[in-house]
Amino acid sequence: MLDSVTDLASLLKDPTLLATKSYVAGEWIAADDGSTFPVTNPARGDVICQLPNLGRAETARAIKAAHAAHREWAARTAKERAQVLRKWFDLCMANQDDLATILTAEMGKPLAEAKGEIAYGSSYIEFYGEEAKRTYGDIIPG
């Protein structure tokens, strides 16, 4: 262990990518009771950030918000959904280095492997964004 706490945000081009709250219903929230838990770098053992220790009430609110968001998402046109997914893909790829740095610190894996994982995972977003344009009805023709 080199030190007990790593200032991971200082290693990022865009430190806002290191979220230390939970995203629920369009807002970044802390635990109702303010409790947190440490996220440690398994390769070094140092703490890279503290995250909210959400309880039952916060989890129930998150599930309710996700259910409502799904209805809103389903109401979008195929083209709108494709545009959102494309934007998400573009953002992932534009921030690949920072996301890989976070992944490396969180998982302890080599940076090159983390960069590949970001690209690979993002390729699924790109694929489904393209598929979102294709509305066939209930069954995709075979």
Question: Which residue ranges define each predicted feature?
Answer:
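Terminal low-complexity tails and localization/encapsulation signals of metabolic enzymes
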Residues: 1-50, 83, 87, 135-142
